[in-house]
Amino acid sequence: MGFEGDVRPFLEKHCLKCHGGEETKGKVDLSAIKTMADAEAHTELWEAVSFVIEDREMPPEDEPQPRDDEFAVFTEWYEDQFLGAAEAKPSEFKPRRLSGPEYRNTMHSVFGFDLEVNIIEAEQTVTEKSLIMKLLPTDPPGESGFVNDTHGARLSTTIWSQYSYLAGSALEELFSPLRSSELEVLVGTPIKGELREAQIRSLLTHFSERVFRRPLSSDRIEASLERIQSESGSDLREALKSEMKRALMSPAFLYRGFLIESDSKTGQQPVDDFELAERLSYFLWEDMPDDELLSIAASGTLRESEVFTAQLDRMLKSPRSRTLAESFGSQWLLLDQIHDDRQEPTYLHALVNQPLDFLNYLFTENRPVMELIDSKVTFANSYTGEFYGDDRKQLERYIKPRGVERVSMPNQKIDLVESAHERGGIITMPGILGMNRGPILRGTWLLRQIMGEHLGEPPPDVPAIKSGPKDKGLTFRERFEEHRADKSCALCHDRIDPLGFALAKYNDDGGLIGKNQGRVKKDAPLPEEIDESGRLPSGETFQNFQELKAILMTSEREKITRNAVEQMMRYALCRKLGRNDSPIVEGITSTIIETDGTWSDLIHGIASSVVFKETLITASPKESHD
């Protein structure tokens, strides 16, 4: 099979009428792509083409449709020859702005404290108290689907003004009596009275190393000292704060990778040790490197295999690695959409933190990747414990602090014994089921977030599924058959519906129908009336969710594993994946499947890859802290 002999004729027969020659709908022109070399020069185009062909969105309904074997020819070429023949290469080097959470965490690491706004007598999370997160606009997800992908984010005058205000506020607090201990940490010696010149030099040295995530030369430190002395007049501290603010407002602080050191040559090359340390720390911690990691980067030994592995393992064991679950895991699985109709903050906290604690356990305790789908343990407290039958008896009694009306109870790890048949894994957690109410939302979430399949947008003219007098006595599944009669709908719903209906025995709160879990509706069906059976596009059938889970753990294991690898790679690299990332994805996926690999194996595979450790320089980067 080849492009010229198989794919080009497919394009000429079914695509060029609208996407070539005089007419180029959607700004997609395929007419000039005649050879494999032409195809390789348009890598991003083929991803979009593959999606619309896979979803049968193209050709349009009113045009002659390819046969199934013709569709298969294109898909096989795209997966096996276009992606399969690619060489693993890093992407072009591009500095990117710190995301809001990265900026907040980095400011905390630089100063040793958070800028906070407290509401008296209100329980708040660290993020809710953060002045930074209240002032900075929320970063939208980039092309990768994650908010740390800020390559296309504009630095507006509004954001610049907010950076200036936050930098000034942090410096004012640092030099206040309240933060004398934090200031002494940066100075390195006890402060008695006014700062001496040696202490100012020490302060600038330590501060700049944190701000720029690498040490600056003594010449630059001396230049800063000269500016302070020339501007100080009668107020040395104000001049010092001005110089420190200058550093906090520099691109070298606000952007990742701005100070990367490169040979004068262009082309593919390893990133320097400090950039590698940054890539590791923002991947695992969403924060700047700590002192140990910076020290190893300075020694030039970070890329040595044993040293690199030891540091990665150390960082995963650190409490700071919880951000991998809270940031990556939450964005991947859309956990911010978990809600509670009861408007009860402590109950919502329990629903959200259950999957977060579970993901943190998987990521940091070296658990198998497929435990995401089926696990013998979960995390629960008295709120979520109601969904786990007698297994909740393992929970130790939590005593609420005196004088506190409401408190968020910590989760405890429990073994699933009595509830193992109905629970286990992330899919059947009450918060996940509750945010995806009904078979369509549940099936769509499972297909997209867990299995990584692409779904096109539904046709705009398809009406919602409503219940009328003629539908009395019909189940949702029966009423839905009319909707499925539309061929354009059936293409996606053949993939969505079996997954969603397999979860039909769980109510809107995520409780088991008939087990008095969650809020029970008056018109809820009896357990024996629920049809959980389904047939997947592969032809495999199941009678209930337990049988579907068995299919997910076997036949769909490769698809689920590959999606996990792709999602974490996008997050780690802060960008969408391209053709030259495919060999890394496939290599890590194969290794995990062959060895029943763990999340730690997955993380090590990404961090050790050429796309993580190297970069492509197309123009000599400037090293400047101005």
PLM regions: where:
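Extended surface/linker regions that mediate inter-domain or inter-protein docking
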Residues: 77, 102, 106, 110-111, ...
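Structured all-alpha helical bundle cores of eukaryotic regulatory proteins
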Residues: 258-270
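Secondary-structure capping and boundary motifs in well-ordered enzyme cores
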Residues: 3, 7, 41-45, 50, ...
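Aromatic- and Gly/Pro-enriched helix-to-coil junctions and flexible linker segments
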Residues: 1-186, 209-210, 214-217, 221, ...
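Short hydrophobic alpha-helical segments that form membrane-spanning helices or hydrophobic packing faces
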Residues: 207, 218-226, 257-258, 382-383, ...
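Large, well-folded core regions of big proteins
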Residues: 190-194, 201, 205, 222-229, ...
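Sequence context surrounding c-type heme c attachment/ligation sites in exported
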Residues: 1-48, 55, 62-68, 385, ...
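Short acidic alpha-helical/loop segments enriched in Asp/Glu that coordinate divalent cations
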Residues: 294-295, 339-345, 503-506
